Amino acid sequence: DKKEMENLLKSKGWDTDTAKRVMRFDSRGNIMINGTKGVQFIQESSDSILSGFEEVMKEGPLAKEQVRNCKFTFTHFVPHEDTAHRGLSQLSPASRRACMAAMLKANPILLEPMLGIEVRVPQDMIGNVATVLSGKRGKVLDMQQKGVTSIITGEIPASETFDISEVMRGQTAGKAMWNTHFKAWTPMPKSIQANLIADTRKRKGLSPEPPTADEFIDRSEEHTSELQSLAYLVCRLLLEKK
């Protein structure tokens, strides 16, 4: 419900005008805002414009993975006068190119799922558990003592947990008991991001290097691409950490 969404955003500190202009707010926190003023045919074109936006949110430019927590402001629209040239097949590709270029200009990053972990071990095994977590890019956040048992609370990237049972039991002589739960999406360390992007793209049959913003921006004076002859979209993207 549009009114309900407006009230929710206002309760989170958004100003009334911006909250009213939200065109789409998807389940992964991606937002498209109508920032245009006095432009014709916006209402009848919105579904086609949002189609391109949604396509990019499903397969982002870095590795064709889902996008999270991005806000786009749709700032300009020069529609074709002929209704036949303002359809889905014309506007959706133009919207997609604008969103891809905006994302790449904003220097997007990869996010990875971070898990919370609680480990119960004898007190003399605390160091062993800390070693396991640190060796898997995790860390200890808190420790409590209950009788002879130490309860260690920490976090660990989901991608590092595939052999956690074998490693944890090996380090604690089988005395550790633990459970994990999803905690948050967190930025992936830059030291491993580039290699992961390249590996993921290769696995999907893509070139190892992600595209650049220039590949989606028409810089010719005549604007001979579909961005001129059909529609011209300019989007500004801000990456926001929740």
Label each region the model flagged.
Residues 222-242:
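Single conserved hydrophobic/aromatic residue that forms the stacking wall/gate
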Residues 1-221, 225:
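Accessory interaction regions appended to the cores of large information-processing enzymes
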